[in-house]
Amino acid sequence: MKALRIYAGPAARKHIERHGLRPQDVRTIPGAAGGPKGLILGPLDRFIFGRWLTQSSQQVHLVGASIGAWRLSTACLADPDAAFERFEHDYVHQQFEVPPGQKRLSPSQLSDKFAQSLEDFYGGRIGEVLNHPRYRLHVVTSRGRHILGREGRARTPVGYLGAFATNSLHRKSLGAWLERCVFSTPGAALPFGTRDFRTRQHALSEANFNRVLQASCSIPFLLAAVHDIPGAPRGAYWDGGITDYHLHLDYQPTDDGIVLYPHFQQAVVPGWLDKGLRWRHKALSLIHI
């Protein structure tokens, strides 16, 4: 199958050579940011969550940013096959009418419509996501610090200019402007190390789920930031892909398991601001993937 390529780190390759690629060995599944590129994985998502993983019973951590968080939240619904079909249909067919006298929708208008889309999709079903018997969901957002702590017409572009400049020198310096803020299924430990970047973890709940998912998908300047999420520190929360575009994380699977990473391209880019920094497009800690 020319459309599908499999890459494996040293430990994962040794494991697969010995046991084959088995659903019971999967411990973590990441879902990258990338907008509509994530839809490429639709048929694979339906196979993995609708047919393949159902042959096993172990706990699996799902780590997603932006559209990856949306995909993996959908995987936690009771009928993932049907849920993914609806997710793809709704994403492709969404239309936003521009009011008379406007050339385009403002970020706040787009955010309001997106919030309603999430409510229409997950309304009455958040409990299915949070109480899934096997899947532990981790939604990555980017929380602004200092000048980016609140959104503003002047402070946001100035803040992101500073973030871009310092990130180009050293990725860890981005933590002066933004921090990784992960919202997880209550009681679930993070399945990756956090020494690489400033990180917080908070619990997902019925009260904050939609706002967290909206924040994880809120691309700066296109959508408005989500402010003051319940159960987390005050501040502006943006797209999780800013800090973790392709979830280039220090995964730490347990029990000799592996990380299965369905991805839409060969390159793994650490952060959104690293897209133009090609020397960072490489695998640093992918031993278990």
Task: For every predicted segment, state its role.
Residues M1-H61, T74-H288:
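Patatin-like phospholipase
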